[in-house]
């Protein structure tokens, strides 16, 4: 299930434990979905014997995959009502649009923020608010470049509806891209998630859309960089 973010006010260790924590902090952990992608090239490198080029290629591939599937700790803001970015990346769109039809929320346009993830960004997705998962729907589709506006409507996607304790609804949509052909979503209907929890991953370039209640004031602009689980996109009234 989702991995919890580091809560604010977590006590710090001292002595040897502090040194170990510093080393761990400098090397982001690996998302479980990336283990096969790292283990296979490592095994090839070990089995390469005297073939140096094979060993180097295996190690380089393992390192690249470890970087792609990195899963750094994040500390969400400790403020009520905030909606944080569900992913690292660059804000591609700040507009209004109808939520995915498969969620059955109607066609009324809602405030939306679209975040584009390049292959160099962290590719885990994090819960934008604390709440209960009311719906999770997968929709098959195309694999156009995720930075195109029409990608929200035509590309393969996975949509999740969250309901906060106050009854407000937030929709977050994982969208596959030109290279991304695999969407991972660990959240299930009925799960209770906390803001900043890791709930999924999209492999190799993608986009994540967040839909907000009507009237929500968005606090970000296109071109702005986001940090998943930390950057505030909006504050719910």
Swiss-Prot record:
Catalytic activity line of the entry: a 1,2-diacyl-sn-glycero-3-phospho-L-serine + H(+) = a 1,2-diacyl-sn-glycero-3-phosphoethanolamine + CO2
One of the record's GO cellular component terms: plasma membrane
UniProt-listed Enzyme Commission number(s): 4.1.1.65
Enzyme class, first EC level, given as a word: lyase
Keyword Lyase part of the UniProt annotation: yes
InterPro entries: PS_Dcarbxylase, PSD-A
Molecular function in Gene Ontology: phosphatidylserine decarboxylase activity
Chief subcellular location: membrane
Disulfide bond sites: none
Post-translational modification as stated in the protein's UniProt record: Is synthesized initially as an inactive proenzyme. Formation of the active enzyme involves a self-maturation process in which the active site pyruvoyl group is generated from an internal serine residue via an autocatalytic post-translational modification. Two non-identical subunits are generated from the proenzyme in this reaction, and the pyruvate is formed at the N-terminus of the alpha chain, which is derived from the carboxyl end of the proenzyme.
The entry's keywords: Cell membrane, Decarboxylase, Lipid biosynthesis, Lipid metabolism, Lyase, Membrane, Phospholipid biosynthesis, Phospholipid metabolism, Pyruvate, Zymogen
Pathway(s) where this gene product acts: Phospholipid metabolism; phosphatidylethanolamine biosynthesis; phosphatidylethanolamine from CDP-diacylglycerol: step 2/2
Positions of the record's site feature: Cleavage (non-hydrolytic): 205-206
Cofactor remark from the record: Binds 1 pyruvoyl group covalently per subunit.
Modified residues (Pyruvic acid (Ser)): 206
Pfam entry (one): PS_Dcarbxylase
Membrane topology classification: Peripheral membrane protein
Keyword Transcription: no
Compartment(s) where it occurs, according to its Swiss-Prot or TrEMBL record: Cell membrane
Cofactor(s) for this UniProt protein: pyruvate
Family assignment from sequence similarity: Belongs to the phosphatidylserine decarboxylase family. PSD-A subfamily.
Function: Catalyzes the formation of phosphatidylethanolamine (PtdEtn) from phosphatidylserine (PtdSer).
Assembly behavior: Heterodimer of a large membrane-associated beta subunit and a small pyruvoyl-containing alpha subunit.
UniProt protein name: Phosphatidylserine decarboxylase proenzyme
Provenance organism: Nocardia farcinica (strain IFM 10152)
